[in-house]
């Protein structure tokens, strides 16, 4: 997956205490739950190398290129869905 950051997305993610390295790991190296929630948006939940479960919202910029809108530590609902799907 090719992705870039929006300026506001990078700032919002860092403000949530999530590092760009954690986001990269989830998007490139982690098993993840991917859900399209609008025609041009994705919601991804995956485990970062730090062990934290990270939720990432992306907006499609062009075919197969995405912009990170925000990333944050997954809440209880995200954790339950991820555990059910991946039996963690």
Residue spans for each PLM region:
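Ribonuclease/tRNase effector modules and their secretory precursors
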Residues: 1-88
């Amino acid at each position: 997956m090719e992705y870039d950051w929006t300026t506001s997305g990078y700032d919002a993610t860092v403000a949530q205490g999530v590092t760009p390295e954690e986001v990269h790991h989830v998007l490139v190296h982690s098993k993840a739950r991917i859900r399209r929630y609008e025609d041009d948006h994705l919601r991804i939940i995956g485990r970062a190398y730090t062990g934290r479960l990270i939720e990432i919202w992306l907006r499609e910029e062009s075919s197969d290129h995405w912009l990170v809108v925000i990333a944050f530590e997954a809440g209880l609902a995200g954790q339950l869905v991820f555990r059910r799907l991946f039996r963690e």
